[in-house]
């Protein structure tokens, strides 16, 4: 992190002595630039191309050096469109990596990969900037104590709890509710924990980014009247951006989060939607740089790139960064190299199931596939652990019996199995929950359920105390008291119909 009062713009430092080169070749978003002998820029240095195109339009393109080719040439990847660039144009070596604004000035604002505001709310204070390329904290700086991060979402808190300062992956195919779950987590965490969040929109739809921004303004996470009171900074590099921007936007968001952790000594939440797009952009850049592809066409440096990002997301003695990352799973194949590489870094996984989404059970979190390293008796306590294990056993037995039920029907099951199926169906429905951010679609008010309430509810179902209630009473409710109240309402309605 550096204090730089002479910064001319967020992404680039003003230099007294300019090191100038010229464009030698343009291949889409990749530029080859020739520099004078002995004046070669370093890897990761930011280069700036300024000038006018053939119709007189102003051009200002920032690139990042990726390769030193020899013969005084470097190969750089552009962070914005290269339309209008021509061979021979002048290129300025800034002498430093891309640097972005950090600190309180970033809250409530939307930035691009260069740290430039894109929300039409005026300039941002850029006196304090930080380079996006940094090494991970030293081992001695890390904090190792284990504690649960309560989200207020029943299925998450009970079966795959999140670690404070950990990394959590949201896995699922297209359209099963990853982004809605992320929005709910931002909403709950801002309200329940009062924490600062940084949202990195990596290669996702611009419409979704806009929807999220509007949602945050409505919920008060972004305070329009007093922008400094906002609880989140947004960084976007969306689908329409060149691969260079999509590859680096995650680092821009992480750099902003690191400042809150290291300097302000805060607990920070870093949301990345979607980490797969970070890998995808790296794959595109790798091909453009002429590297031989690896398995399934991915870049050979996949593990290195993922590691350099993930190792910086950690808890130190100053504060913590808890990261929640949406992971798009191509063709729902968890063995694909991109999600498989991501798995290695995660403390918890929340797997979203298309089957549950088809049944209308939201959030469509798969209770048997989702895992957490925190679900151990010494961390969560015996009561929580035992309840979670019994819920999983009941659901697993129901899954095993489904083929028999499909062929022979429920009547052929033993009394014990019929009871297990009935309780499993109640549990399945009780794992659903109305979300605050989905109120506009469902008309049901959102519910935040504390961990103690969640455990109590599932214990009552497992003990058989609620065997007499209809299973639809457990669908889309908050705590167990709401389920019993809903059952009474259903009973009254059925009597009135008769």
Curated annotation (Swiss-Prot):
<comment type="function">
    <text>Produces ATP from ADP in the presence of a proton gradient across the membrane. The catalytic sites are hosted primarily by the beta subunits.</text>
</comment>
<dbReference type="InterPro" id="IPR027417">
    <property type="entry name" value="P-loop_NTPase"/>
</dbReference>
<dbReference type="InterPro" id="IPR024034">
    <property type="entry name" value="ATPase_F1/V1_b/a_C"/>
</dbReference>
<keyword id="KW-1278">Translocase</keyword>
<dbReference type="GO" id="GO:0042776">
    <property type="term" value="P:proton motive force-driven mitochondrial ATP synthesis"/>
</dbReference>
<protein>
    <recommendedName>
        <fullName>ATP synthase subunit beta, chloroplastic</fullName>
        <ecNumber>7.1.2.2</ecNumber>
    </recommendedName>
</protein>
<keyword id="KW-0472">Membrane</keyword>
<comment type="similarity">
    <text>Belongs to the ATPase alpha/beta chains family.</text>
</comment>
<keyword id="KW-0406">Ion transport</keyword>
<dbReference type="Pfam" id="PF22919">
    <property type="entry name" value="ATP-synt_VA_C"/>
</dbReference>
<keyword id="KW-0934">Plastid</keyword>
<dbReference type="InterPro" id="IPR050053">
    <property type="entry name" value="ATPase_alpha/beta_chains"/>
</dbReference>
<dbReference type="Pfam" id="PF00006">
    <property type="entry name" value="ATP-synt_ab"/>
</dbReference>
<dbReference type="GO" id="GO:0005739">
    <property type="term" value="C:mitochondrion"/>
</dbReference>
<keyword id="KW-0139">CF(1)</keyword>
<dbReference type="InterPro" id="IPR036121">
    <property type="entry name" value="ATPase_F1/V1/A1_a/bsu_N_sf"/>
</dbReference>
<dbReference type="InterPro" id="IPR055190">
    <property type="entry name" value="ATP-synt_VA_C"/>
</dbReference>
<keyword id="KW-0547">Nucleotide-binding</keyword>
<dbReference type="InterPro" id="IPR003593">
    <property type="entry name" value="AAA+_ATPase"/>
</dbReference>
<keyword id="KW-0375">Hydrogen ion transport</keyword>
<keyword id="KW-0150">Chloroplast</keyword>
<dbReference type="InterPro" id="IPR004100">
    <property type="entry name" value="ATPase_F1/V1/A1_a/bsu_N"/>
</dbReference>
<dbReference type="InterPro" id="IPR020003">
    <property type="entry name" value="ATPase_a/bsu_AS"/>
</dbReference>
<keyword id="KW-0793">Thylakoid</keyword>
<dbReference type="GO" id="GO:0046933">
    <property type="term" value="F:proton-transporting ATP synthase activity, rotational mechanism"/>
</dbReference>
<dbReference type="InterPro" id="IPR000194">
    <property type="entry name" value="ATPase_F1/V1/A1_a/bsu_nucl-bd"/>
</dbReference>
<keyword id="KW-0813">Transport</keyword>
<dbReference type="Pfam" id="PF02874">
    <property type="entry name" value="ATP-synt_ab_N"/>
</dbReference>
<feature type="binding site">
    <location>
        <begin position="172"/>
        <end position="179"/>
    </location>
    <ligand>
        <name>ATP</name>
    </ligand>
</feature>
<dbReference type="GO" id="GO:0016887">
    <property type="term" value="F:ATP hydrolysis activity"/>
</dbReference>
<keyword id="KW-0066">ATP synthesis</keyword>
<dbReference type="GO" id="GO:0005524">
    <property type="term" value="F:ATP binding"/>
</dbReference>
<dbReference type="InterPro" id="IPR005722">
    <property type="entry name" value="ATP_synth_F1_bsu"/>
</dbReference>
<comment type="subunit">
    <text>F-type ATPases have 2 components, CF(1) - the catalytic core - and CF(0) - the membrane proton channel. CF(1) has five subunits: alpha(3), beta(3), gamma(1), delta(1), epsilon(1). CF(0) has four main subunits: a(1), b(1), b'(1) and c(9-12).</text>
</comment>
<dbReference type="GO" id="GO:0009535">
    <property type="term" value="C:chloroplast thylakoid membrane"/>
</dbReference>
<keyword id="KW-0067">ATP-binding</keyword>
<dbReference type="GO" id="GO:0045259">
    <property type="term" value="C:proton-transporting ATP synthase complex"/>
</dbReference>
